[in-house]
Amino acid sequence: NWRNISVSTSLNNNDDNVMFINTGNIEVTLPPDVPGHTIYFKRMSGGVRLTGGRILPAPGGQEMSYIDLDFASGFIKCMGNYWVMFYCG
């Protein structure tokens, strides 16, 4: 499922590819834990803060309640009870 997002919202368990096209700052809530689920993303302009659940900024990182995305493409994967962030350069 592909989704363009321009306002604050919640992601769904069927969101697989997300492009953030907002111009201002938005807050996006992750779906409930679904082990193995991966959400690919691309941030185009405005600020994006991911919230909800237990978030790790990288494998082995310290748990956070939110993470601010940079402009790189990446993905966030549900691994057990955590959403783990990976960037693709």
Say what each PLM segment does.
Residues 1-54, 79-89:
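Exposed extracellular interaction/assembly regions and N-terminal maturation sites
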Residues 46-48, 66-70:
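Short, surface-exposed, polar/charged, turn-prone segments marking secondary-structure boundaries
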Residues 55-68:
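Terminal beta-strand-rich extracellular "head" domains
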Residues 70-80:
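Extracellular disulfide-bonded cysteine-rich modules/repeats
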